[in-house]
Amino acid sequence: MPQTSTTQFFYLSALGIWGLWVYAFFNGMFDRLDTITRTLHFPDGRPLRSKYTNIGPLDAQLTLLSAFYDVLSNTLTSGPRLLFFDVNYVVACANLWVLIESRRRGVRSWFLKYPAWAMVLCNANGAAIVLPLYLYLVCCSKARLRDASVPKHEATALLVSTVVILLQPLLIFVPAWAGRGGSHLHHGCIALFQVAPIGVSVFHLGLASILPREASDSSPSSRKDSKKCIVASLVLAGTVAAAVHSYTVVGALITRDGQASLTRLFVPAHGFSDPIEVPLQPSGLPAEYMALVENLHLFSQWDWIVVALTSVLYSHLLLSLRDGAVRAKANHWVSPVEAQELVYLTVATIILGPGGAASFALAIRESRI
């Protein structure tokens, strides 16, 4: 079996561009979103909020993102919402992974020390495109070789920050589920979600700054305590993400709704075809709205697929006894142990979902450092 390498992150990002944006260019997604942002109304007649900060260019971007996220998170359809819920918890786990790596003592690069910018781009442009490129930088960093430890006060703060990170996706879904506040509140929460990674970073740094610091912060006992906090954070995130994935899969298996079947959720369809030209299951909603749902669901499907592959690659590289930067230069086949780990990761990703499998794998990896 050929070895995994950091170069494969570029292939995954390219696949993300193809699945997210190339298809969107040909299947009418861009045109439909443009129409909605110009008219400020969805095809089903609901209004689209356009004022958030009174800064024109920023409001225009937030309006576009609100239109996108609204269609995939409202209660008008079931299947696309289920998958999008799962996707957002995988990305939430990725938020935690990069936050942990940014807190290691050996990190020197500002790009890696403050990863919020990358996670904001994941929310705004597609995690399938941005996340592989950022994790490439993480894997190629020499920070783990210099000093992989995390200060105890930072590790303690991670436990609380993990809870905050896991609450982030609820900003998108709870307003629609609750049915209160209408589109105005829902779109406001979606806009807040876009900058939530910045808020989490500020919260974490602020919390870490007020926690007491030990004089012997680098002692073996302190490092052991730090490791326990990091492992606990990863296990918590993995448990929640696995529960969300199980909810998605079980819901798809037991439902009689054809819009939420397992193949409907995870198997991409249509591709270059405009969904308006394909016979769709009657739903009582305008055909143009359902075509937009199909456009965005295809986007979400490819997002999930690429992020799943990225999480397997990332966790496998970090589980390896050799550093990712070194592995990329060697032209070897994987050892039997590494091949076994890759198989386990793949199976776990199918069963537990990408967020759960990778988080548990990274918890194991943390114990090896």
UniProtKB/Swiss-Prot annotation:
One GO CC annotation, please? membrane
Mind listing the GO molecular function terms for this protein?
isomerase activity
Instruction: Tell me where in or outside the cell this protein is found.
Output: Membrane
| Induction pattern | Expression is positively regulated by the depudecin biosynthesis cluster-specific transcription activator DEP6.
Q: Give the record's keywords alphabetically.
A: Isomerase, Membrane, Transmembrane, Transmembrane helix
Task: Tell me where on the tree of life, at the top rank, the source sits.
Answer: Eukaryota
Identify its membrane topology class: Multi-pass membrane protein
Q: What is its EC number?
A: 5.4.99.-
Keyword tRNA processing found: no
What pathway, per the record? Answer: Polyketide biosynthesis
Just give the chief location class.
Answer: membrane
Q: Where are the transmembrane segments?
A: 9-29, 82-102, 118-138, 157-177, 190-210, 234-254, 298-318, 342-362
What residue ranges carry the coiled-coil annotation? none
Family as reported in the entry's similarity comment = Belongs to the membrane-bound ascI terpene cyclase family.
Function summary: Part of the gene cluster that mediates the biosynthesis of depudecin, a highly oxidized eleven-carbon linear polyketide that acts as a histone deacetylase (HDAC) inhibitor and makes a small contribution to pathogenesis. The reducing polyketide synthase DEP5 is the central enzyme in depudecin biosynthesis by yielding the backbone polyketide chain. The monooxygenases DEP2 and DEP4, as well as the uncharacterized protein DEP1, then act as tailoring enzymes to modify the intermediate polyketide chain into depudecin.
The name this protein goes by in its record: Terpene cyclase DEP1
